[in-house]
């Protein structure tokens, strides 16, 4: 097999593995507005790009505050 074909085959296999991992991780996350109790012994993560809000303990969109 030529080197180019081997590289393509490796990239295809790697992308399939990453996709499988991403869908498995995404299946364990909770959506926007769902309760995300920070004190739970088995915490569940909010789906990307959500974060668990400190004041509401629900999944909210992540924000970045930049001070001028």
Curated annotation (Swiss-Prot):
Question: Which positions form S-S bridges?
Answer: 29-47, 36-52, 46-59
Stated family: Belongs to the venom Ptu1-like knottin family.
Protein name per its UniProtKB record? U-reduvitoxin-Pr3a
Query: Which spans of this chain does the record mark as coiled coil?
Result: none
What are the annotated GO cellular component locations? extracellular region
Signal peptide range equals 1-22
Q: Which GO terms describe its molecular function?
A: calcium channel regulator activity; toxin activity
